[in-house]
Curated annotation (Swiss-Prot):
One of its GO terms (cellular component) is cytoplasm. It catalyses: cytidine(1402) in 16S rRNA + S-adenosyl-L-methionine = N(4)-methylcytidine(1402) in 16S rRNA + S-adenosyl-L-homocysteine + H(+). The keyword Ribonucleoprotein does not apply. It is found in: Cytoplasm. The gene is rsmH. This is Ribosomal RNA small subunit methyltransferase H. Transmembrane segments: none annotated. Residues 328-337 have a biased composition (Low complexity). Residues 314-327 have a biased composition (Basic and acidic residues). Belongs to the methyltransferase superfamily. RsmH family. Disulfide bonds: none annotated. It comes from Azorhizobium caulinodans (strain ATCC 43989 / DSM 5975 / JCM 20966 / LMG 6465 / NBRC 14845 / NCIMB 13405 / ORS 571).
Length: 346
């Protein structure tokens, strides 16, 4: 997840980060930036991928981030690169509109690095980390309901569903019940307060994942509508890439990777024919897979940056076929999330 998204040797949900770009060599190899080309980095963070792209070729980069702190922190890189970098405060589901507004469409490449950044984890006041006491916030763009709002407002069944669906937490019902019981005594407004509640329900052996990891993941994804945003960004990239343009996506857990895998699988297959319908109708493939399956980090990278162990990279090249209609995108999401996109815009 770029400089500011890769983290160091402690737990990804809360420890101090060293800001190491994850799978940087693999990202550059699959993105293949060109001189005079234009690439879009949809998740700027602290600019690790963006800087590397600018150093790899004498082209232009448009970098997007929904977090205003990241945009402010990138101004020095804008000045350093002599006008080849444009920073935009926006959600990456709108990346096609950003490129069009800047007169940069169609694009030669799009890179997406999904999830929370280590900068956000490092700042206790952002409320992402269960290891750092802070307000239970988790909003990447400081708009809309916070994690504390969800914890206060969702009923027990809804909480359990969020924690199970978005955190893949098998103790979701017990955790939801504990949250409801605890909030009846006093409001849950601090990160460590919630982490303590979860830790009393989920036990972990020394060296295992912190008990609150999956619950925090679920709330963060829900607060920021991360899966809906990812689906929107994939479709936006399909619309704005030129033929031969590359899409590279790095994910860090199975929910994200499954969406990317299914999207690229569907977009890279020709319509199926059968003896009943020998001339199958349907959209032509809009992508060609560059990486056959997921690319994973090497052992040396994982040893130096343990968070990289869960990273998966998928890459594809745009064909000259028209973009597919958006009607089938909802199938990439859990059913109850497919109708919730676009409630908020930062």
């Amino acid at each position: 997840m770029k400089t500011g998204r890769g983290v160091g040797p402690t737990d990804a949900a809360g420890g101090p980060a060293r800001h190491l770009p994850v799978m940087l060599a693999e990202v550059l190899a699959h993105l293949a930036p060109k001189d005079a080309g234009t690439c879009l980095d949809g998740t700027f963070g602290a600019g690790g991928y963006t800087r590397a792209i600018l150093e790899a070729a004498n082209g232009r980069v448009i970098a997007i981030d929904r977090d205003p702190t990241a945009i402010a922190g990138g101004q020095a890189l804008v000045e350093e690169t002599g006008g080849r970098l444009t920073l935009v405060h926006e959600r990456f589901s709108h990346l096609d509109q950003v490129a069009q507004d800047l007169g940069a469409a169609p694009l030669d490449g799009v890179v997406l690095d999904i999830g929370v950044s280590s900068m956000q984890l490092d700042e206790a006041d952002r409320g992402f980390s269960f290891r750092r006491d802070g307000p239970l916030d988790m909003r990447m763009a400081n708009d809309g309901p916070s994690a504390a709002d969800l914890v206060a407002d969702l009923d027990e069944v809804e909480l359990a569903h969020v924690i199970w669906t978005l955190g893949e937490e098998r103790f979701s019902r017990q955790i939801a019940r504990a949250i409801v019981n605890a909030r009846a005594e006093s409001p849950i407004t601090r990160t460590t307060q919630l982490a303590d509640i979860v830790s009393k329900v989920v036990w972990a052996k020394p060296g295992e994942m912190h008990p609150a990891t999956r619950t925090f993941q679920a709330l963060r994804i829900a607060v920021n509508e991360e899966l809906q945003e990812l689906v929107g960004a994939l479709a936006a990239a399909e619309r704005v890439l030129k033929p031969g343009g590359r899409l590279v996506v790095v994910t860090f857990h199975s929910l994200e990777d499954r969406i990317v895998k299914n999207f690229l699988s569907h977009r890279s297959k020709a319509p199926s024919a059968s003896r009943h319908m020998p001339q199958a109708e349907g959209p032509a493939p809009s992508f060609r897979l560059v990486a056959k399956g997921a690319v994973e980090p090497g052992s040396d990278e994982v040893a130096g940056n343990p968070r990289a162990r869960s990273a998966k990279l998928r890459a594809a090249e745009r064909t000259d076929a028209p973009a597919h209609p958006d009607g089938d995108l909802a199938g990439l999401l859990p059913a109850d999330l497919s109708q919730r996109r676009g409630r908020r815009r930062s």
